[in-house]
Amino acid sequence: MAVPKRRMSRSNTRSRRSQWKATATELVNVTVGGQNHKVPRRLLKAARLGLIDLDRR
């Protein structure tokens, strides 16, 4: 495992960590039972197979 050669200051650590940003998942249109729904791409197959409840909002 990599070990830092020198101690990193708190401000440097926090400014480095602040660069990590969460992104919203892109929604894809899927037609189930004649109705259009928007679901994340990773849930597309489950939505088509009826494994998830799409009417719950």
Swiss-Prot record:
Keywords: Ribonucleoprotein, Ribosomal protein. Residues 1-21 are annotated as: Disordered. GO terms for molecular function: structural constituent of ribosome. Residues 1-19 have a biased composition (Basic residues). One of its GO terms (cellular component) is large ribosomal subunit. InterPro entries: Ribosomal_bL32, Ribosomal_zn-bd. Coiled coil: none annotated. Belongs to the bacterial ribosomal protein bL32 family. This is Large ribosomal subunit protein bL32. The gene is rpmF.
